[in-house]
UniProtKB/Swiss-Prot annotation:
SUPFAM superfamilies hit by this protein: SecB-like
Principal location listed in the UniProt entry: cytoplasm
Pfam family name, one: SecB
Tree of life domain: Bacteria
Single GO BP term: protein transport
Species of origin: Thioalkalivibrio sulfidiphilus (strain HL-EbGR7)
GO CC annotations on file: cytoplasm
Subcellular location: Cytoplasm
Subunit structure: Homotetramer, a dimer of dimers. One homotetramer interacts with 1 SecA dimer.
Keywords: Chaperone, Cytoplasm, Protein transport, Translocation, Transport
Protein name: Protein-export protein SecB
Function statement: One of the proteins required for the normal export of preproteins out of the cell cytoplasm. It is a molecular chaperone that binds to a subset of precursor proteins, maintaining them in a translocation-competent state. It also specifically binds to its receptor SecA.
An example molecular function term from Gene Ontology annotations: unfolded protein binding
Length: 168
């Protein structure tokens, strides 16, 4: 028997597992406060898109729910034409990963997986409400995650550089 075949060998790596168990539409809302008047005027859309994601453990066996919230507000002529909010969620199995990798999986990889489904729901709702097709650009969740880490790191560095007991 070689060292790698012996039970409890020091070289054993923890087994990592990652899988999408289920994805689902958790909540959806569409508001068209100016219908039908909005369809009679000139269409000059100004769109604001907001993204938010959160993850929470479902058990101690590595199941997590990741929820991606996509809020799209479109104004025309300075007034809200429509507001769509979609909460796309998924149950993911993620275990055996180091803390740093787990953070990336839950905050970047999982939302990347969920985004196409949320985008499709928004597009479908906007179209069914009678508005021109809404095409949302892809989102780089890896870059957003890296930006958040950098902001958190900068915030901690700023706190550490201030002398204890100092007031401003």
């Amino acid at each position: 028997m070689t060292d790698s075949q012996q039970p409890g060998a020091a070289t054993e790596q923890p087994k990592t597992e990652f899988a999408l168990q289920k994805f689902y539409l958790k909540d959806v809302s569409l508001e068209c406060p100016r219908s039908p008047q909005v369809f009679t005027g000139e269409w000059k859309p100004e769109t604001n898109v907001q993204l938010n994601s959160q993850a929470r453990p479902l058990d101690d066996q590595g199941l997590f729910e990741v929820e991606l919230t996509l809020t799209v507000t479109t104004k025309s002529g300075g007034e809200v034409a429509y507001l769509v909010e979609v909460k796309q969620a998924g149950v993911f199995l993620a275990r055996g990963f180091p803390k740093e990798q787990m953070g990336h999986l839950l905050a970047a990889y999982c939302p990347t997986t969920l985004f196409p489904f949320a985008r499709e729901a928004v597009t479908d709702l906007v179209s069914k409400a009678g508005f021109p097709q809404m095409l949302l650009a892809p989102v780089n969740f890896d870059a957003l995650y890296a930006q958040q880490l950098a902001q958190n790191h900068a915030g901690k560095a700023g706190e550490e550089s201030a002398p204890a007991g100092a007031s401003h």
